[in-house]
Regions:
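Cytosolic, long alpha-helical scaffolding segments
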Residues: 1-209
Length: 209
């Protein structure tokens, strides 16, 4: 089943990897859109709709993976892990979209720099996840990408804690404080979800070793 701690697969099941590559690509695309909005929040409604459109594409890719799973007798790795990986990747995109939506819902037109910093970390995590997913098919070194996602999540924790502490120290408007605190928390959850996806990838590799 494996060689060198990586997954071997039946060529007829390559469609799974194509769908996972598509889904992970949407993660990176959505995260980059979010980062751009937070760095320069013009035309909020239109640009947040673009993130939502990517999130819908991710939902369709996730559904396609689950449909393929239900139709397949032979799979490249455990059925449960295929479901977990699809769901965990989709979760990252869901929370990326949720963060973008907070900007419109709460009319946050001047997000703090820490928000774009967190979004930048999400972009890096999504890029690492995409590389890790691609290497499942190519028998490559998945683990280093999982480890980097986890390191980035630790960094995001520090950024989020500092940002929230700064809010409580400096923000005098309690309503604005609540809105920005929630934005930071949703962004931080997105980084947590990326770590969850990396942990699923790692488990797949370890089971195949």
């Amino acid at each position: 089943m494996s060689r060198g701690g990586v997954v071997r697969f039946i060529p007829t099941e390559a469609k799974f990897f194509e769908l996972f590559a598509e889904l992970s690509g949407y993660l990176t695309e959505g995260a980059k859109l979010l980062r751009g909005i937070l760095e320069d929040p013009y035309d909020l409604d239109m640009r947040v709709e673009q993130v939502q459109a990517i999130e819908h594409k991710g939902d369709r890719a996730t559904h396609a993976i689950i449909t393929k799973l239900n139709q397949s007798f032979i799979t490249p790795f455990d059925r449960e892990d295929i479901h977990k990986l699809a769901s965990s990747l989709d979760d990252v995109l869901d929370f990326t979209n949720a963060a973008a939506n907070r900007l419109v819902m709460y009319k946050i037109t001047q997000p703090p720099p820490a928000a774009s910093e967190l979004a930048g970390l999400i972009v890096l995590q999504c890029e690492e996840l995409a590389q890790g997913v691609s290497l499942l098919e190519k028998n490559g070194a998945v683990m280093k990408h999982c480890e980097e996602v986890n390191r980035l999540e630790d960094e995001a924790d520090h950024v989020s804690r500092r940002a929230i502490a700064s809010l409580f120290d400096g923000e005098k408007d309690p309503i604005k404080l609540i809105k920005l605190k929630e934005l930071f928390e949703v962004l931080e959850v997105a980084t947590d979800k990326a770590e969850d996806a990396a942990n699923v990838l790692e488990a797949i590799v370890l089971k195949s070793a």
